[in-house]
Amino acid sequence: MINIAIAEDNNIALNTLKEKLSAFPDIILKHTAKNGKEAIENIETSSEIDILLMDIEMPVMNGIDATEKIKKQYPQVKIVMITIYDDDDYIFNAIKAGADSYILKDTKAEKIYETITDTLNGGSVMSPSIAIKALQLLKNAAHIKYFSKQDVPLLSDRETEILEQLSKGHTNKNIAENLFIS
């Protein structure tokens, strides 16, 4: 069983996400929150959360700030950003805050489930459009205003190959097969 929580302030988006997840009997929804502060409070009272699906733009406390606080106090909780935002600032700040995966809200149910399981198994999943932007961010890191020297991650050739495969929409399983990773 996979214990999840959702932080989402929009009722329509929350209900859509719940409906998508209801197709998977091994997913148990433990909590929902309307903002990042509530998400933190839910985790403080329930140590059984495996994964948190986190929106970015919410009142009181946004998802990026909440992610940073949760990762400091509860590093075992995996966080998947699930949002409509695919701009560079959101991507960079979410990853910097500690998000484990980053997908868009229009992602199909099966892909959300795959993202959850891959993330729980130590993977990092990105929607293809997000992976493309992340790759561009890394390639252009020296020219971007919000990178300091310690922020610029040095990727190995292998890590760059994997990110390029993600940007093409390949699943973690396909990437492993394509790059001969066991």
What are these regions (language model features)?
Residues Q136-Q165:
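Regulatory hinge/linker segments at domain boundaries
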Residues D55, T83:
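Active-site residues of response regulator receiver
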Residues G169-S182:
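Recognition helix of helix-turn-helix DNA-binding domains
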Residues M58:
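Receiver (REC) domain active-site loop signature in two-component systems and cognate sites
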Residues E8:
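Conserved acidic carboxylate
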Residues S47-L53:
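Active-site beta3 strand of CheY-like receiver
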Residues N35-E38, N62-D65:
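Acidic catalytic/metal-coordinating carboxylates
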